[in-house]
Amino acid sequence: MAKVESFELDHTKVKAPYVRLITVEEGPKGDKISNFDLRLVQPNENAIPTGGLHTIEHLLASLLRDRLDGVIDCSPFGCRTGFHLITWGEHSTTEVAKALRDSLKAIRDDITWEDVPGTTIESCGNYRDHSLFSAQEWCNDILKKGISDDPFDRHVVED
């Protein structure tokens, strides 16, 4: 089996919440795609419940696109500790961390249920498994710790 970078990462060494650049891939025509680890909670210490994670996922799909050029996808990790963010081009971890921080602030402070996209049977494959309350509580906890642009040393991004 092929080696997967995220399974090679020593999860005992990282200090969440953080943004980590996993890789930049270059296509045959020179286009670049970046893959980021948006780790919201410390691995093997906690996990975001599916309802909250699902709601954060739907909101980040829009909020990150509002704050960062070239977003292709933002998908949750199966371990429920964060997300993969895939973008066109290259962004610094600081730039991504600020966009993530501002998106989580919006979820915590500004979002109402009516703002959450994709919560109907027609628009979501598991529309019953959402919790804005859980999403906002988790965002509050994550923001209290601050988002670091370094996975191994706490370097919290400021305004």
Curated annotation (Swiss-Prot):
The keyword Transmembrane does not apply. The gene is luxS. It catalyses: S-(5-deoxy-D-ribos-5-yl)-L-homocysteine = (S)-4,5-dihydroxypentane-2,3-dione + L-homocysteine. The keyword tRNA processing does not apply. GO terms for molecular function: iron ion binding; S-ribosylhomocysteine lyase activity. This is S-ribosylhomocysteine lyase. HAMAP family: LuxS (MF_00091). It is an enzyme of class 4 (lyase).
